[in-house]
Amino acid sequence: MAIHPTAIVEAGAQVDPSCEIGPFAVIGPLVRMGPGNSVGPHAVVTGRTTLGASNRIFPHAVIGGIPQDLKYRGEDTALVIGDRNTFREFATVNLGTAGGGGVTRIGSGGLFMASSHIGHDCQVGDGAIIANSVAIAGHVLIEDHVHFGGLSASHQFCRVGRLAFVGGMTGVAMDVAPYCTVAGARGELAGLNAIGMQRAGLTEEQIGRVKQAYKIVFRSSLGLAEAIAQLEAELAGHPETDHFIAFLKGSQRGITR
């Protein structure tokens, strides 16, 4: 284990011997770190935080800080992070709250750029790209391979579907359907994330079905319930459209249209 002599690893912390802890970094007593993690100078990993393998935490990031929630009263809550994530300078990720399930979760393979924030009780999937100064409020669900452009933000309790793309300086206040792009200060629908689907390996046939679903929901005069019924009648039975349908049916805040 490479621990700089100025770093503080508090008693009780479980840190794999292969980890690197940089100058003036602080590792709290409830932290558990798997193999190959690196924590940069002046970074803080605290709270009941569990990290998998090979995560990189850059200078001044704070991982596992208490929730920015006035209802929080010191309850024993947690943060669970997967493997191979990168948290750049001044990124912050908060613990969960008792009222929100108690656990904030980050998947694997994500990039959380400088000054980005993941709020309490968020559930972030694999392969997230969260650009500079993005602010994700509490209780937000971000599915796999979602991209938030710089200076964008999400309201509490929103859901952002798989392979969605949120443009820079966009405010998300309603759910963003899978495969879709939203842009603008008020988070307006801007089309499909065709490039993202191609990069993720969807076939032309699969992308074609997503396009059909998109037209039924967003380019017809149907209400959402009617559109979902048509999707179930015409496009059910395929993983990409089944997920699209399930996401729409599960919306509590409404869908960005």
From Swiss-Prot:
Coiled-coil regions, chain positions: none
Origin: domain of life: Bacteria
A single cellular component GO annotation: membrane
Class of this enzyme: transferase
SUPFAM superfamilies for this protein: Trimeric LpxA-like enzymes
Catalyzed chemical reaction(s): a (3R)-hydroxyacyl-[ACP] + UDP-N-acetyl-alpha-D-glucosamine = a UDP-3-O-[(3R)-3-hydroxyacyl]-N-acetyl-alpha-D-glucosamine + holo-[ACP]
EC number: 2.3.1.129
Gene3D superfamilies linked to this entry: Hexapeptide repeat proteins, Udp N-acetylglucosamine O-acyltransferase, C-terminal domain
Disulfide bonds: none
Pathways involved: Glycolipid biosynthesis; lipid IV(A) biosynthesis; lipid IV(A) from (3R)-3-hydroxytetradecanoyl-[acyl-carrier-protein] and UDP-N-acetyl-alpha-D-glucosamine: step 1/6
Main location per the UniProt record: cytoplasm
UniProt keyword annotations, A-Z: Acyltransferase, Cytoplasm, Lipid A biosynthesis, Lipid biosynthesis, Lipid metabolism, Repeat, Transferase
Molecular function as annotated in GO: acyl-[acyl-carrier-protein]-UDP-N-acetylglucosamine O-acyltransferase activity
Localization (cell): Cytoplasm
PANTHER family, alphabetized: ACYL-[ACYL-CARRIER-PROTEIN]--UDP-N-ACETYLGLUCOSAMINE O-ACYLTRANSFERASE, ACYL-[ACYL-CARRIER-PROTEIN]--UDP-N-ACETYLGLUCOSAMINE O-ACYLTRANSFERASE, MITOCHONDRIAL-RELATED
Free-text function comment from the UniProt entry: Involved in the biosynthesis of lipid A, a phosphorylated glycolipid that anchors the lipopolysaccharide to the outer membrane of the cell.
Family: Belongs to the transferase hexapeptide repeat family. LpxA subfamily.
Subunit structure as annotated in this protein's UniProt entry: Homotrimer.
Protein name stated in the entry: Acyl-[acyl-carrier-protein]--UDP-N-acetylglucosamine O-acyltransferase
Organism: Anaeromyxobacter sp. (strain K)
Gene that encodes the chain: lpxA
